[in-house]
Curated annotation (Swiss-Prot):
Record gene name: rps25
Protein name (Swiss-Prot/TrEMBL): Small ribosomal subunit protein eS25
GO annotations of cellular component type: cytosolic small ribosomal subunit; extracellular matrix
Stretches for region Disordered: 1-39
Cross-referenced Pfam families: Ribosomal_S25 (PF03297)
GO function term, MF aspect, one: RNA binding
This protein's UniProt keywords: Ribonucleoprotein, Ribosomal protein
Homology family: Belongs to the eukaryotic ribosomal protein eS25 family.
Record's keyword annotation contains Ribonucleoprotein: yes
Keyword set includes Transcription: no
Amino acid sequence: MPPKAAGGKSKQIQASKAAAKGSSGGAGRKKWSKGRSREKLNNAILFDKETYAKLLKEMPTAKVITTAVVSERMKCNGSLARRAIKELLSKGLIKQIIKGHGNGVYTKAQ
């Protein structure tokens, strides 16, 4: 097979690709976007008497009770919310619907 003639098609393609690479973008490198930050929640780590009374009054009447719901309504952290759910369950005020590995879904006991 004889050698290819200089200035073949592949050389032209490579030259056009190199030109396209050099002139793309115009603005240079893309900048990193600023990450959105949420405000820090100052949730309680212990129940005081008023909050505990509110827990015993409000939570057994809720339709859906999860760790997140208790934490949001009572303004307590997640571990305290899990303990509160365990206590309500042991007192028979709520019943379990779904049991997961880390969390569960509960509802009012009628």
